[in-house]
UniProtKB/Swiss-Prot annotation:
The lineage of its organism: Eukaryota, Fungi, Dikarya, Ascomycota, Saccharomycotina. The active site is at C150. It is found in: Cytoplasm. Its main location: cytoplasm. It is an enzyme of class 1 (oxidoreductase). This is Glyceraldehyde-3-phosphate dehydrogenase 1. InterPro entries: GlycerAld/Erythrose_P_DH, GlycerAld_3-P_DH_AS, GlycerAld_3-P_DH_cat, GlycerAld_3-P_DH_NAD(P)-bd, Glyceraldehyde-3-P_DH_1, NAD(P)-bd_dom_sf. Homotetramer. Signal peptide: none annotated. NAD(+) binds at R11, I12, D33, R78, N314. SUPFAM superfamilies: Glyceraldehyde-3-phosphate dehydrogenase-like, C-terminal domain, NAD(P)-binding Rossmann-fold domains. Belongs to the glyceraldehyde-3-phosphate dehydrogenase family.
Amino acid sequence: MVRVAINGFGRIGRIVLRIAMKRDGIDVVAINDPFITNDYAAYMFKYDSTHGRYDGEVTHDDKDLIIDGKAIKCYQERDPADLPWGDNDIDIVIEATGVFTAKDLAEKHITAGAKKVVITGPSATAPMFVKGVNDDKYTSDVTVISNASCTTNCLAPLAKVLQDNFGIEEALMSTVHSQTATQKTVDGPSKKDWRGGRTASANIIPSSTGAAKAVTKVLPELEGKLTGMAFRVPTVDVSVVDLTVRFAKDVTYDEIKAAIKKASEGEMKGILAYTEDAVVSTDFLGDTHSSIFDASAGIQLSPRFVKLVSWYDNEYGFSARVVDMVELVSKA
């Protein structure tokens, strides 16, 4: 049984806990969040506006969050180096604050006594691994890894199938992305991104994203061939990747569909999914796949030029991959 701690009990931290508690072999024994008291942690875990009420018993005391009778120790330390991970025999820390994404900052958990760290977001300095794409390259000597971003986890499996089967000459990605906690409820200051400071619930907001660039980190053969942007839209969850691709050789849309369907039933089962149904975004709430290819939504202009569409629950699907990475790291 791998002993796990979660640092940061926000959207991803709480959903990761929901998923981890259903996995055999993972024991979440501690949570740290300096901004949340135990009673508030219990409330936020129990009630979720997007994914619904937790189907179980949630209580707390002065020291613990108690879920279905299981006590999870709670701490409120600002500096990860001050956490008692050694005293708690923590094997892996899930770094979910969005603050300690740099490798040297995440290593504070190791200073505190943990053995390894999985960062729930892209990192400029820690190696990134995407399930189904390059996770087979992970080696046990690597102590800090990044699980990349929700959008990278959607795009990378799709891009890998396309690259392996047809060769990508160049590609542009747009993600139509649900609003997140970094956005504003009303117009407010956002010095680095003026548009990002506009009211999230009233606007479609063009934005930058590092997701496409991150894909080239896990698929180096696409370096210089892929970039992208985002549109933030007023939905609470579920996003969709729009990928426009120029292939290196002629291909039919049926061949593209067949290759993706084959991968979804084979080496990428559980990661990449395939549908021909007339779906919309809410159909994917709670979906644990990284990427769900929408075969009936794509279009083709010429034998080498196509637009492909793939959905993802940017909260639940990504959180499922975080837990997968914990399992990978624990077994390596």
